[in-house]
């Protein structure tokens, strides 16, 4: 089924000039960019995005990280996009990420892992509404 999903190239990926490399990974796997914007996440958006982590010991570090500098928000579209993107990204921790995945290639840590992607079709819809209210 054709799906849409959100990918965030996090501040560490933007700071390291990896936007083009990362987008190529998705496009080379048949996914299409349908929306893209470079933006600085506000604390309000970051807190909504990471609301499931509120109260956890890493929450403030996560909010500070995602709001420190611009990120690149993208909507990708393609066949089984949600699962395919997560496979292309690899495991959250670079030490667990399979060879050839974005996180294996570019991530520095579990937090500075370059990318976020929607984990379900439902969360993709919610994240599109959050990050792309104009769409």
Stretches with model-predicted labels:
Residues 1-135:
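Non-catalytic terminal and connector segments of soluble metabolic enzymes
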């Amino acid at each position: 089924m054709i799906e849409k999903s959100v990918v965030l190239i996090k501040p560490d990926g933007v700071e390291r000039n990896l936007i083009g490399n990362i987008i190529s990974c998705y496009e080379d796997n048949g996914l299409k960019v349908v929306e893209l914007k470079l933006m600085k996440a506000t604390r309000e958006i970051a807190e909504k995005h990471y609301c499931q982590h509120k109260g956890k010991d890493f929450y403030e570090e996560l909010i500070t990280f995602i709001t420190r500098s611009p990120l690149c928000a993208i909507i990708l579209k393609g066949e089984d996009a949600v699962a395919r993107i997560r496979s292309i990204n690899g495991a959250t921790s670079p030490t667990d990420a399979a060879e050839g995945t974005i996180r294996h290639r570019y991530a520095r840590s579990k937090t500075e892992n370059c990318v976020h992607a929607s984990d379900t079709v439902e969360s993709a819809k919610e994240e599109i509404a959050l990050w792309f209210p104009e769409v």
